[in-house]
């Protein structure tokens, strides 16, 4: 009897793993598609790099559904890659306002674990400090490169802020 339960539990774990891998592939396909359509593959690579590195190190915000998560990823990727010289003044305002509003909101919610992978309280404190550190660096970089009007530096700062603040 226990053996049947163990097999069913293993099937659930395998099913969850397959769904997770498919979600990651879907997210990467969206990133590649947006990068291809906008002809900003390098910018997309920088964004995805920041996203993965910061998400792994700082935890993150989890949207209520996978569709919302994927949509948010795509929207903020699109906003971020537009920071490389296109609509720069409007983009600066969008990023600065978004960064501060979302940073304030998520300061109380990030990092959060999942049912499958809860984060112990001691680790949450460390991850929250890491997130704040990345956000402070991003905001400092954004301010500096905005004043100096450095497009690629501005884009990198946007990547740090958008990934660090929105996805922790």
Where are the regions a protein language model picked out?
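Cytoplasmic-side transmembrane-helix entry/capping segments in multi-pass membrane proteins
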Residues: 64-75, 92-98, 123-125
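Hydrophobic alpha-helical transmembrane segments in multi-pass integral membrane proteins
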Residues: 80-92, 133-152
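Hydrophobic transmembrane alpha-helices
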Residues: 1-43
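Interfacial aromatic-anchored transmembrane helix boundaries in multi-pass membrane proteins
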Residues: 56-72, 78-83
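C-terminal ends of transmembrane helices
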Residues: 51-62, 109-114
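Alpha-helical transmembrane segments and their cytosolic interface
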Residues: 143-168
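Alpha-helical transmembrane segments
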Residues: 89-104, 158-159
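Membrane-helix boundary/juxtamembrane motif in polytopic membrane proteins
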Residues: 112-138
């Amino acid at each position: 009897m226990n053996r049947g339960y163990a097999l069913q539990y293993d099937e659930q774990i395998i099913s969850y793993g397959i769904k997770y891998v498919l979600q990651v592939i879907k997210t990467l396909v969206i990133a590649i598609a947006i990068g291809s359509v906008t002809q900003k593959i390098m910018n997309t690579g920088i964004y995805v790099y920041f996203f993965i590195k910061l998400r792994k190190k700082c935890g993150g915000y989890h949207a209520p559904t996978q569709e919302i998560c994927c949509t948010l990823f795509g929207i903020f990727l699109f906003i971020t890659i537009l920071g490389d010289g296109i609509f720069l003044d409007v983009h600066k305002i969008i990023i600065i306002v978004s960064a501060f509003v979302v940073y304030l909101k998520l300061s109380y919610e990030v990092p959060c674990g999942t049912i499958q992978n809860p984060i112990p309280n001691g680790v949450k404190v460390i991850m929250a400090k890491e997130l704040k550190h990345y956000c402070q660096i991003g905001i400092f970089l954004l301010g500096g490169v905005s004043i100096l009007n450095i497009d690629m530096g501005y884009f990198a700062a946007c990547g740090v802020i958008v990934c660090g603040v929105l996805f922790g």
